[in-house]
Amino acid sequence: MSKLLETMKQTKDMIKNYRKYLKKIENSIKTILKDSQIFLFGSIITGNLVAGSDIDILIIANVPKKHLKRAELIAEIEENAGLPLSHPFEFHLLTQEELNTWIKIYKLRFEDISAYLES
């Protein structure tokens, strides 16, 4: 099987079994950004999750303004959670103030990650 097809199959399997990964992701986020709040939004909470979807993870924390620093935090979260280079999880780091703006502009609907963790 080609590397591309293997990656696509792995991503599809991760979407199908996303709950298995969420606890590792939550633990990683809480280790790196101790006072963070973690939510899910997008197709995962609207019930429209399909094989080609991503899983949007919203992290509210006291994060740096610079996008490069945020990208470094995301890379650290991914590595600490043991995620492969290609995965369906899309991380969004926001401050509380930025979240308030997002809610006004995008009418954002989100739910706490705990509702989606494997029991």
PLM region descriptions:
Residues M1-Q37, T46-G52, A61-S119:
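Catalytic core of pol beta-like nucleotidyltransferases
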Residues F41-S43:
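Glycine-rich beta-strand-to-loop/alpha-helix junction loops that act as flexible
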